[in-house]
Amino acid sequence: MLDRLVSQRTKLTTYFVLNFLSVFFASYVSFKAVVFFSAYIFGIWFYSHKLKRVPFLGNFVSATLAIAPFFAVFVYYKNFDTVIFVHALFLFLLILAREMIKDLENMAGDMAQNYKTIPILYGAKFSKICISILIGLTLVPSFLLIEYFDVGYMYIYFIGCIFLLLGFLVLLVKSNSKKHYVWLHNILKLIIILGVFSILLINVDLVLNRIL
């Protein structure tokens, strides 16, 4: 859709302008910020040109790049609390599962483009097994964040995630068409979007004090 609406030249121009602006504004923060965003931009380029078509590694790098900006600020301020890494693990596993669902969803197009994705090389059944393992692993940090860490009212979100992920696993077993994979993809996207808004629940009193 985007390829039909926007020319390649426009996309490249926008890409370079936005990257330049991100590095420019980062220079006002610190030299470390410039290094981080420069490395991040290079990582995106390297992934899109060299790693995107590599099964397993491409999915892993894509998920890593997706979570990197969210946790860079904690690294910058040297905040290495365990709860942050558990949150990062939860998000990483969720995004990695989403990347693999996208491969199932786009099998026909990837075959036409001669992409060697996991479901094309090893079959949809193998991909489902891998996704099931990832979702099972995602349940672990969800449980840890509920039982062992103070996440305020965000525990409600993680309880909801457990039920959604269990439902996801049931639907995954029964899925056998692109329509089913789109639904599964949307479930994971919903969990991620709700997670962003649920950050406000970590400390409701603090948020209310800032607003009022």
Regions found by a protein language model. Give the residues of each.
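Multi-pass alpha-helical membrane architecture of UbiA-family
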Residues: 1-212
